[in-house]
Amino acid sequence: MGKHVRLRKGFDINLAGKASPTIATTDQPDVFAIKPTDFQGLYLPRVLVNVGDTVKAGTPLFRDKKFEKVVFTAPVSGEVVEIKRGEKRKLLEVRILADKSFQHVEFRKYSAGDLASISREEAQEQLLASGVWANLIQRPYGVIADPNETPKAIFISAFDSHPLAPDYELIFKGEEQYFQAGVDILKKFTAGSIHVNLRGDTQSSIFSGAKGVEFNYFTGPHPSGCVGVQIHHIDPINRGEIAWTINPYGVIQIGKLFLNGIYDTSRIVALVGSEVMKPQYYKTWTG
């Protein structure tokens, strides 16, 4: 049974520049970059492409030398135009000139009814090959999840309490089937619970209908939406234990991978702040 937690300590900072509930479209940027520094715990990246190579969304760009099956893939299709390195040839970023044709590597596609028959090994292989595995974060330490480990539980914070945080009900509207599919895949990786943590003082139309999860409800000021705080109150990590976390965007990306057979990096972000002339939401892509 889920928990109801009220946080009394914390503070909500009321900043100017909150995004209006409108979603604007933008042109796809010309150049995308994937940086190893964006992935905490990446031991030593090994480049898998060369300048001039043509890639599709989902093509591996580099991999983790410690866990060689963990690859990091192109967010869009195009041409690799630069492999930027720093001191001692440290990889800084891989830059892609987008062709704006939205070509994808084709992964195996499943119907929603077939997801239950997928084994953990099959699910893990597709998550690793597509680059979607990088959404899974292992605690303690907050690093990319070790494919050889089994977490005691998986935690999903379904709201954000940071100042000027985006409205999840807006940016994930219409993604319910993909969220459910992502949950169905995640259940294969733990014998424990999939915890979906909701804001206790509002009703979620996006996440509250998910099946096979344990709902927990949090009220109170920031940091009530931070998954680490939520883990502390729901099921603290003891010595020798690990847990995995993933944000709703990652869960939905897993769902799209298995239902549509593609690595989909499109997302909606909020451009906010007191210096922004027109704070609002924009549809864009990772990278």
Mark where each language-model region is.
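Short coil-to-beta-strand transition motifs
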Residues: 69-77
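Short histidine-centered loop motifs in beta-beta connectors
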Residues: 45-54, 58
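N-terminal, Lys/Arg-enriched amphipathic/low-complexity engagement segments
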Residues: 1-48, 215-218
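Buried, small/hydrophobic-residue-enriched core segments of structured protein domains
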Residues: 70, 84-286
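Short, solvent-exposed loop/turn positions at domain surfaces
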Residues: 43, 49, 66-69, 278
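Short, charged beta-turn/beta-strand-edge "cap" motif at the junction between a beta-strand
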Residues: 60-69, 87
